């Protein structure tokens, strides 16, 4: 017996309260005991998470955080985990004794949604000695361990030999491995399967009768019969396709005329547009070539005009440049004339101002002398007045002192003090600190001598100063003149510079006298130089136009050569005109012949098309009209023979059909009356009894019974006698055989078997010899073999009949085509090809056009050469008179030389004009510069110094005189002499004082008078100086302006400037006249160029548009041609006769066909859309697509193997024959495919019975289950009343509803849904379609109702409902149903998985305290009998007697929670045995 797989242990790593805990699972029941919050639900949650790691399903509702939002994805799992990496692992042993560890790595994801990240994995090949906790933890020390991340776990396992580690990216792959290894009972292919599995676990976990399970028990227990549904769907699809084909055939048959009309109009519509585009393409090509030729011609003309324009523009630019230069020269000459006139006026002003300045200079010098004399006299008067003042002051002082002395004569001390004061003042003034009264007299003489010396020196300096002032005035005048001419210089260099300036002045005056002769000479040479430059320009222009450089000596010979060329070209132009006329005449004749041939070509092409069609249809070549008439006679004879053979084949085909219909009768009866007689007599046809005879025995039994093989076997012949009376509706020979139809044998005859024959001894005197038939018909196998061979023969006959019919119709159509050809085209069909002649004439026309073009080019070149020769002669006529100037090479050098000399002379003239007066004034007084007189300023300073010295000496002498005079005061011995002496002195002093005051008054009067006169002199001098300075400044400004003007104003300058201006004005007028002529010619040339440019631009635009149109049309045309060739419709569309119609005619033809097509395809959406798209004139390929779509539309309705001609009408006629055969075949096929409603009912009933039996077998496993008052549990399966009525109607009363099942508009599913609605009108079907309802009715599961029943106490069998059962009874009932579901899954999965493996079987039960001891014991018995593992979570009051119990206690140690776990095995009377490894495990790790 196969051992069932088991779960060995559950391992929790880093869960809330469990750091590294492994729970060893009992083979039957594992109990988790503990109080509230001990960790029981957490342990079960870890198991469920490892079993179904789907976050969309997991929901531990009893521990979901309060207040969690609906958007939270926690579902109670996030709070059971601790931070970091967490694991939940299941250690299993399957039926093959393979250890498999499956589990998940969990980790909290930071965020408000409290998400959890889950990664499933599996480990295979792990040794039994390795514990799960050792894999995922790493011991750091005695009290600390670390949880390994998943990547480190992978690396650790890969390092272990023989161990396989698999990490899964999808839950489906994870469950697939668990199913293959026998860990779970069902393959969970989808989220729906996982949801069912989770709902089962959830129902087990929370106990009771789960409404989610009981409501969907059909989905859990009844397998889907997808094969039956697919068979029905395939049948319906085949019927639908068959009916659609039949409908299409009927539509095709009804649309035959429409197809003919569609083909005709589509051909006209597309072919007309196709040929119009072909014609337009040819026309566009011709136009593009014509535009290109005109474009090349216009470009050549434009190039010639541009060359001409460039030459004239160059000449005009030269004239414009020359005009600019001339205008500039003329303006410069005018400006020069104005400047000369201005300079002359300025020169006159300068001369007037210079005369005024000379006069003012003289007056200023005279006034300076007057002022100087007045200043000297003023100084003398000031000195006398000052001396008089001093003298008066001294006398007054002396007189005052003396009076004071007289007043204080008695006071000697005052006098003595005055004497001492005088002595001190004398010491100070005389700078004699050792002066005494005794030595004062001596020093007085000394200082008086010094005063006399100072006075003499002052007088001497005054005389020198008067003499030096005159010399200084002449030197300064000469020095200022030199400075004015030469610029600043040292005074000692004035003499040398003045002599050099005088010599230079002589030379400059000599050069200035040569200005006028040089100017006249230069004007003459410049005129010749301009003429020479003009001749050189003309020669260069001539050489440029000729494209060759010529020497001066060659010009006369070239002139004669050009005149000869002009005469020759004139003759050539006249001859070319006659040749051009002849070519144009021939061209017009060719064009007329081509037009006549183009009118005849369409008729010939139509005849040729008809003739080619006839040749293709009959496979003959016709060279004359006689061949056509002879072949028509042969065609009539062939038509008669084909009609006779077709009628014979048709008769044989009808005979075969009748025989097939006869042999196809049920029971092998060839006569329907025999079936009715057999039913009437209560017998059975002999053929029905032997219906199962093999094909090998069929000849024997056919010969054995002979004519009686159609007999009726009846139980008693005597009972048939009464029915034979008056029997008329029967075969001529009716055989009746008595016997039991259930045990009939062939012992009624005496038979001798021969070679391929039998001898039947009917009676002693009657034998029958029957040979074995070659084609036996006795028995179903023989009939089917014969029918098969008849069908094969019928196929051959049908094909032959179709072929003959097609040949007859083809021959008839061919006869009609020949008749139409003879009547319409025979007269012109065998004439010569006009298109070939048109091609030859077009080739000749192209040659003529090319000859004309070449002739025009040659003629144009000759005209150009003629014009060039004329221009060359004109240019030479202007150059030849100036050859002598061209030969003068030194003219420019002479001009430059004279211009340099003139510049020097003009510079000298400007120098003389500017400094001539200064030089004239300098020349008489230049000698005073030889020696520089004493410095006048120094002399003035010395004079002033001597005056000061004389004044100081006078004061010193006066001071000493006073001391000497007061010397008596130093002695008091002789007072009487002093008084008498003082009286005389007083008188003298008074006299002197009066004289001094009188002198002072006179000096003051003289000083005031002379000061007034000096003031007048100074005012006059200031006025003269101001006038002089003003005129000098104006003169300097005029001279600067004259220098700025830059011209030398002499007597002939104005005349020369005026002559130069007039010459330039004449040249400018001539240049403007030529420029105007060139501008007019250039304007005309530009107008011609503009016209040519516009024409060229228009030609370019037309050409490029046409070229682009040609290129675009070429691309589109290539696509059209490719599409035409790929689809093989070129022959139909390329109708050459349409090429000679105009575009309007073709467009009209296409538009008329388009209107007809719109009506023809109005009901066909595809063709209507394609036709609408084809109306785009820019997309001609879409018309081809429409034509191809029309053909494709026909091909979809005509079998490809019967389209034997390109003529659509012939194909449709042939299709008529084939469609009739197809209709018959499809009708018979539909009858074979159609399944009867009785068969459907039987299939569904058989399926329901099979599943009821399976549920009954499952119920047997629950018969012994009892708990509480529940004696037994079962699952009741019943057929719904409405569906049972449907099955009855389908099997018994289906004939009443054949309107539904025989309708071609309804599928079988829809008919079934309509029948269901007809039988149950009270049921609301909602928004579901009949097809959906019908598909549901084809699923047998919808016919069944399932409910759980319990046998409870005295109530008997009741429906299991939570309200009618106690809590424990409900849990037990639910557990029983879950076990049934698991059992059903295992049975179903044995077909998918090997039968040598038995999966693990484990359920949960939380809060088991609701069960009593008997119920718990019942669960233990159930687990033991079903080999099922059970995990129970219960409070501490549960003490099972069997299994393994874990006691969980949650403790808090140092703010850290951990669960204390103690495991016990069983509860025997002896002391409980502590399980190994059940000590408290540390729950914290660093």
From Swiss-Prot:
A GO cellular component entry from the record: cytoplasm
Keywords per UniProt: ATP-binding, Cell cycle, Cell division, Chromosome partition, Coiled coil, Cytoplasm, DNA condensation, DNA-binding, Nucleotide-binding
Binding site for ATP: 34-41
Keyword Transport part of the UniProt annotation: no
Alphabetized Pfam families for the sequence: MukB, MukB_hinge, SbcC_Walker_B
Gene Ontology biological process terms, A to Z: cell division; chromosome condensation; chromosome segregation; DNA replication
Region (Flexible hinge) residue spans: 666-783
Keyword Cytoplasm in annotation: yes
Chief localization: cytoplasm
Cellular localization per UniProt: Cytoplasm, Nucleoid
Molecular function terms from GO: ATP binding; DNA binding
PANTHER family the record matches: CHROMOSOME PARTITION PROTEIN MUKB (PTHR42963), DUF4476 DOMAIN-CONTAINING PROTEIN (PTHR42963:SF1)
The family this protein is said to belong to: Belongs to the SMC family. MukB subfamily.
Free-text function comment from the UniProt entry: Plays a central role in chromosome condensation, segregation and cell cycle progression. Functions as a homodimer, which is essential for chromosome partition. Involved in negative DNA supercoiling in vivo, and by this means organize and compact chromosomes. May achieve or facilitate chromosome segregation by condensation DNA from both sides of a centrally located replisome during cell division.
Self-association and partners: Homodimerization via its hinge domain. Binds to DNA via its C-terminal region. Interacts, and probably forms a ternary complex, with MukE and MukF via its C-terminal region. The complex formation is stimulated by calcium or magnesium. Interacts with tubulin-related protein FtsZ.
Name this polypeptide is given: Chromosome partition protein MukB
Source organism (scientific name): Escherichia coli O1:K1 / APEC
């Amino acid at each position: 017996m196969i051992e069932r797989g088991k779960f060995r242990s559950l391992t929790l790593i880093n869960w809330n309260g469990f750091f590294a805990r492994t729970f060893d699972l009992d083979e039957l029941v594992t109990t988790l005991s503990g109080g509230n919050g001990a960790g029981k639900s957490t342990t079960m949650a870890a198991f469920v998470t490892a079993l179904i790691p789907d976050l969309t399903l997991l929901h531990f509702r009893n521990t979901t955080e309060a207040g969690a939002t609906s958007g939270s994805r926690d579902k109670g799992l996030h709070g059971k985990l601790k931070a970091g990496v967490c694991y939940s692992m299941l250690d299993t042993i399957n039926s093959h004794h393979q250890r498999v560890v499956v589990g998940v790595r969990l980790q909290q994801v930071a965020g408000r949604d409290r998400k959890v990240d889950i990664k499933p994995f599996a480990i295979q090949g792990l040794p039994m000695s390795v514990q799960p906790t050792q894999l995922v933890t790493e011991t750091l020390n005695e009290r600390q361990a670390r949880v390994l991340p998943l990547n480190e776990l992978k690396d650790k396992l890969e390092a272990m030999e023989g161990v396989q580690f698999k990490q899964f990216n999808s839950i489906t792959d994870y469950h697939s491995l668990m199913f293959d290894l026998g860990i779970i009972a069902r393959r969970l292919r989808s989220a729906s399967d996982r949801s069912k599995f989770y709902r089962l676990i959830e129902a087990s976990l929370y106990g009771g009768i789960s409404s989610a399970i009981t409501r969907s028990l059909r989905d859990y227990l009844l397998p889907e019969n997808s094969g039956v549904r697919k068979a029905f769907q395939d049948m319906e699809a085949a019927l639908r396709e068959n009916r659609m084909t039949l409908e299409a055939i009927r539509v095709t048959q009804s649309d035959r005329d429409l197809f003919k009309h569609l083909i005709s109009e589509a051909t006209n519509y597309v072919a007309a547009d196709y040929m119009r585009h072909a014609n337009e393409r040819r026309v566009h090509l011709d136009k593009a070539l014509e535009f290109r030729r005109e474009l090349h011609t216009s470009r050549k003309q434009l190039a010639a005009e541009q060359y001409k324009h460039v030459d004239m523009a160059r000449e005009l630019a030269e004239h414009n440049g020359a005009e600019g230069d001339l205008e500039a020269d003329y303006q410069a000459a005018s400006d020069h004339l104005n400047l000369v006139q201005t300079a002359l006026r300025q020169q006159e002003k300068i001369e007037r101002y210079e005369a005024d300045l000379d006069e003012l200079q003289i007056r200023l010098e005279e006034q300076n002398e007057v002022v100087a004399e007045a200043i000297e006299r003023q100084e003398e008067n000031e000195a006398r007045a000052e001396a008089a003042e001093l003298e008066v002051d001294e006398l007054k002082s002396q007189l005052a002192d003396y009076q004071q002395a007289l007043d204080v004569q008695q006071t000697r001390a005052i006098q003595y003090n005055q004497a001492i004061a005088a002595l001190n003042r004398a010491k100070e003034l005389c700078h004699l600190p050792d002066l005494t009264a005794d030595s004062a007299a001596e020093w007085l003489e000394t200082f008086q001598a010094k005063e006399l010396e100072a006075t003499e020196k002052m007088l001497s300096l005054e005389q020198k100063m008067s003499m030096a002032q005159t010399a200084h005035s002449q030197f300064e005048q000469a020095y200022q003149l030199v400075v004015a001419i030469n610029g600043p210089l040292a005074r000692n260099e004035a003499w040398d510079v003045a002599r050099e300036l005088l010599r230079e002045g002589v030379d400059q005056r000599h050069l200035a006298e040569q200005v006028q002769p040089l100017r006249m000479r230069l004007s003459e040479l410049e005129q010749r130089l301009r003429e020479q430059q003009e001749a050189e320009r003309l020669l260069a222009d001539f050489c440029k136009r000729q494209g060759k450089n010529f020497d001066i000596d060659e010009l006369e010979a070239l002139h004669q050569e050009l005149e000869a060329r002009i005469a020759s070209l004139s003759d050539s132009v006249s001859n070319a005109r006659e040749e051009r006329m002849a070519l144009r005449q021939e061209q017009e004749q060719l064009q007329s012949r081509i037009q006549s041939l183009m009118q005849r070509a369409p008729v010939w092409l139509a005849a040729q098309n008809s003739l080619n069609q006839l040749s293709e249809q009959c496979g003959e070549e016709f060279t004359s009209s006689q061949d056509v008439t002879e072949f028509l006679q042969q065609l009539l004879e062939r038509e008669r023979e084909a009609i006779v053979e077709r009628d014979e084949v048709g008769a044989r085909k009808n005979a075969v059909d009748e025989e097939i219909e006869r042999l196809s009768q049920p029971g092998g009866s060839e006569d329907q009356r025999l079936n009715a007689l057999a039913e009437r007599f209560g017998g059975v046809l002999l053929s029905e009894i032997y219906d199962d005879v093999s094909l090998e025995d069929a000849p024997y039994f056919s010969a054995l019974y002979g004519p009686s093989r159609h007999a009726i076997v009846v139980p008693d012949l005597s009972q048939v006698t009464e029915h034979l009376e008056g029997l008329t509706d029967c075969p001529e020979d009716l055989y009746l055989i008595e016997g039991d139809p259930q045990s009939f044998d062939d012992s009624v005859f005496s038979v001798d078997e021969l070679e391929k024959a039998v001898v039947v001894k009917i009676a002693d005197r009657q034998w029958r010899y029957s040979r074995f038939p070659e084609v036996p018909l006795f028995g179903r196998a023989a009939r089917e073999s014969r029918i098969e061979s008849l069908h094969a023969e019928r196929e051959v006959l049908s094909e032959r009949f179709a072929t003959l019919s097609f040949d007859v119709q083809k021959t008839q159509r061919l006869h009609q085509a020949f008749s139409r050809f003879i009547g319409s085209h025979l007269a012109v069909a065998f004439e010569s090809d006009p298109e070939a002649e048109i091609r030859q004439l077009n080739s000749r026309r192209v040659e003529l056009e090319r000859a004309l073009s070449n002739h025009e080019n040659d003629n144009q070149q000759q005209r150009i050469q003629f014009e060039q020769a004329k221009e060359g002669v004109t240019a030479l006529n202007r150059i030849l008179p100036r050859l002598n100037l061209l030969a003068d090479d030194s003219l420019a050098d002479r001009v430059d030389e004279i211009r340099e000399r003139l510049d020097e002379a003009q510079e000298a003239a400007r120098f003389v004009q500017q400094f001539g007066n200064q030089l004239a004034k300098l020349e008489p007084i230049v000698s005073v510069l030889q020696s520089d007189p004493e410095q006048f300023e120094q002399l003035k300073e010395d004079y002033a110094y001597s005056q000061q010295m004389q004044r100081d000496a006078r004061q010193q002498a006066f001071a000493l005189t006073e001391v000497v005079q007061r010397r008596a005061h130093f002695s008091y011995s002789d007072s009487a002499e002093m008084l008498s002496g003082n009286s005389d002195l007083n008188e003298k002093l008074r006299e002197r004082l009066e004289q001094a005051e009188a002198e002072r008054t006179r000096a003051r009067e003289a000083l005031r008078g002379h000061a007034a006169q000096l003031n007048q002199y100074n005012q006059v001098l200031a006025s003269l100086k101001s006038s002089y300075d003003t005129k000098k400044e104006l003169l300097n400004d005029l001279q600067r302006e004259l220098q700025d003007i830059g011209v030398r104003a002499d007597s002939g300058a104005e005349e020369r400037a005026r002559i130069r201006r007039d010459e330039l004005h004449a040249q400018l007028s001539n240049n403007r006249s030529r420029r105007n002529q060139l501008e007019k010619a250039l304007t005309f040339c530009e107008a011609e160029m503009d016209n040519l440019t516009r024409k060229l631009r228009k030609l370019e635009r037309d050409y490029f548009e046409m070229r682009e149109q040609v290129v675009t049309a070429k691309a589109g045309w290539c696509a059209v041609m490719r599409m035409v060739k790929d689809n093989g419709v070129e022959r139909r569309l390329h109708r050459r006769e349409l090429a000679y119609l105009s575009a309007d005619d073709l467009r009209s033809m296409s538009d008329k066909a388009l209107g007809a097509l719109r009506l023809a395809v109005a009901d066909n959406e595809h063709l209507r859309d394609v036709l609408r798209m084809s109306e785009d004139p820019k997309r001609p390929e879409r018309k081809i697509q429409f034509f191809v779509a029309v053909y494709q539309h026909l091909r979809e309705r005509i079998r490809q193997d019967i389209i034997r001609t390109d003529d659509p009408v012939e194909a449709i006629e042939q299709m008529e024959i084939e469609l009739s055969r197809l209709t018959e075949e499809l009708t018979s096929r539909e009858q074979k495919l159609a399944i009867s409603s009785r068969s459907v009912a039987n299939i569904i009933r058989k399926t329901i019975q099979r599943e009821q039996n399976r549920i009954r077998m499952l119920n047997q496993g629950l018969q012994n289950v009892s708990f509480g008052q529940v004696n037994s549990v079962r699952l009741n399966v019943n057929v719904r009343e409405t569906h049972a009525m449907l099955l009855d109607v389908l099997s018994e009363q289906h004939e009443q509803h054949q309107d539904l099942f025989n309708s071609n508009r309804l599928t079988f599913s829809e008919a079934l849904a309509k029948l269901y609605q007809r039988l149950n009108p009270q049921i609301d079907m909602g928004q579901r379609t009949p097809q959906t309802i019908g598909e549901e009715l084809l699923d047998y599961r919808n016919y069944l109702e399932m409910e759980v029943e319990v046998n409870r106490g005295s109530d008997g069998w009741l429906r299991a409902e939570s309200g009618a059962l106690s809590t424990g009874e409900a849990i037990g009932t639910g557990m029983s149903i879950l076990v049934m579901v698991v059992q059903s899954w295992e049975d179903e999965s044995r077909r998918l998985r090997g039968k040598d493996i038995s999966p693990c079987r484990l359920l949960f039960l939380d809060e088991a305290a609701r069960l009593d001891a008997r119920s718990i014991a019942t669960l233990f018995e159930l687990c033991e009998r079903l080999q099922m593992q059970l995990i129970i979570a219960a409070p501490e009051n549960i003490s099972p007697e069997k299994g393994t119990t874990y006691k969980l206690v949650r403790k808090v140690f140092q703010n850290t929670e951990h669960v204390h776990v103690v495991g016990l095995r069983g509860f025997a009377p002896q002391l409980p045995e502590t399980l190994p490894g059940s000590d408290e495990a540390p729950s914290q790790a660093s």
